[in-house]
């Protein structure tokens, strides 16, 4: 059976969890991807075939502020262009099933070609301020119409009430929680190094001030930090602004790009994140407490940060409150409840293994279709025999 996985390339979280899906399924199914940009390059490193497409939107922001209006209403990228391209890809590859991670142009293309499709997302609802209600809420309503027409709507998160993306969800009839869908296998060994603070804020330059502030705090307090920048341009600027002579220093390590995120997370004491869902899933699956600093005007990240705070496994800070970052670091290091609660989430992640559960769902999907085909085939043969028998009696 052939499965085509389509990836939204805005942010890296969609890409990493789609790689996890491919790795979970590749031994029993033929797997290919639809992707673009850095996501396409990343997936190809795992040896999968990737069809190139176009983005539907492009995330935009400045000085820590996410601009949702400019991201949705942009002249640069058009969903129509992506749909046309993806219709051609689906016709060429002819998959038995399509899995779409927030790439709704692919869902539309699949429905037009009458192909079964499973949606994966950590958001189908939001609470946002009034000035963009006329854009955000109609968009979400339209997407939920699409979501409900998919075979399944899969949420790669812990079940309620431990769901990190709970405040970004509206329960729909075909929704199913499968647990964290991360690339890595989490080892049972607990005696990790845990001797540094890891900043993982993604590759968007408008989050730069978080990196800079954390670097200054580390130099001031002699804290060990590792700062993942997402690009060499950001890394070079950070090195200059912190007056450092190299990427690797006594207690501050600047990492432009990494291919070793598992070891970085596994051996960290705590994680500083921007609130992306996949990063939080990875941190909690390893039992790491978090400091979450969502982009301004980014409701999804803000809601994730609030849930981390409500579960007591981390601290949520506003981008406008970076002056509190030093205090937050000390609180997490000194107050044992954060580590204790994060460790409980790690145990929960072992119980709800997203990769095993997605494999089970796909296996059941194909088994059900096989049984339905067998039933209809048997039914048709039986009808033919009955009709033939009736003719003989006459």
From Swiss-Prot:
Principal EC category: transferase
Keyword Transferase attributed: yes
Enzyme Commission code(s) on record: 2.4.-.-
GO molecular function: glycosyltransferase activity; hexosyltransferase activity
Taxonomy, superkingdom: Archaea
Keyword annotations of the record: Glycosyltransferase, Transferase
Annotated SUPFAM superfamilies: UDP-Glycosyltransferase/glycogen phosphorylase
Gene3D superfamilies: Glycogen Phosphorylase B
Similarity comment text for this entry: Belongs to the glycosyltransferase 28 family.
PANTHER family, sorted: GLYCOSYLTRANSFERASE (PTHR21015:SF22), UDP-N-ACETYLGLUCOSAMINE--N-ACETYLMURAMYL-(PENTAPEPTIDE) PYROPHOSPHORYL-UNDECAPRENOL N-ACETYLGLUCOSAMINE TRANSFERASE 1 (PTHR21015)
Protein name (record): Uncharacterized glycosyltransferase MJ1255
Organism this protein belongs to: Methanocaldococcus jannaschii (strain ATCC 43067 / DSM 2661 / JAL-1 / JCM 10045 / NBRC 100440) (Methanococcus jannaschii)
């Amino acid at each position: 059976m052939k499965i085509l996985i389509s990836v939204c390339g805005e942010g890296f979280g969609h890409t990493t969890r789609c790689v996890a899906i491919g790795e979970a399924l590749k031994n029993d199914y033929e797997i290919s991807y639809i992707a673009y940009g850095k996501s396409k390059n990343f997936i190809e490193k795992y040896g999968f075939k990737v069809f190139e497409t176009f983005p539907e939107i492009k995330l935009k922001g400045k000085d820590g502020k996410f601009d949702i209006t400019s991201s949705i209403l942009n002249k640069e990228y058009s969903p129509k262009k992506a749909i046309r391209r993806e219709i051609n890809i689906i016709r060429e590859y002819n998959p038995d099933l399509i899995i779409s991670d927030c790439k709704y142009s692919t869902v539309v293309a699949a429905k037009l070609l009458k192909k079964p499709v499973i949606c994966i997302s950590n958001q189908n609802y939001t609470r946002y301020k009034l000035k963009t209600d006329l854009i955000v809420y109609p968009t979400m309503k339209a997407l939920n119409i699409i979501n409900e027409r998919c075979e399944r709507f899969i949420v790669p998160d812990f079940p309620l009430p431990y769901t990190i993306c709970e405040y970004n969800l509206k329960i729909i009839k075909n929704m199913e929680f499968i647990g964290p869908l991360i690339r890595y296998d989490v080892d049972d060994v607990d005696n990790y190094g845990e001797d540094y603070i890891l900043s993982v804020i993604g590759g968007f330059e408008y989050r730069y001030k978080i990196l800079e502030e954390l670097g200054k705090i580390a130099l001031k307090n002699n804290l060990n930090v590792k700062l993942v920048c997402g690009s060499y341009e950001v890394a070079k600027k950070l090195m200059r602004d912190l007056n450092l002579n190299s990427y690797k220093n006594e207690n501050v390590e600047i990492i432009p790009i990494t291919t070793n995120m598992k070891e970085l997370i596994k051996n960290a004491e705590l994680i500083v994140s921007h609130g992306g869902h996949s990063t939080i899933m990875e941190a909690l699956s390893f039992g790491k407490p978090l400091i979450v600093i969502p982009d301004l005007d980014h409701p999804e990240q803000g809601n994730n940060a609030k849930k981390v705070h409500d579960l007591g496994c981390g601290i949520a800070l506003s981008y406008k409150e970076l002056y509190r970052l030093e205090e937050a670091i000390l609180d997490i290091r000194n107050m044992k409840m954060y580590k204790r609660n994060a460790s409980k989430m790690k145990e929960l992640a072992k119980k709800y293994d997203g990769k095993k559960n997605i494999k089970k769902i796909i296996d059941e999907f194909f088994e059900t279709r096989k049984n339905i085909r067998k039933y209809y085939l048997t039914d048709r043969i039986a009808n033919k025999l009955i009709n033939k028998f009736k003719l003989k009696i006459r």
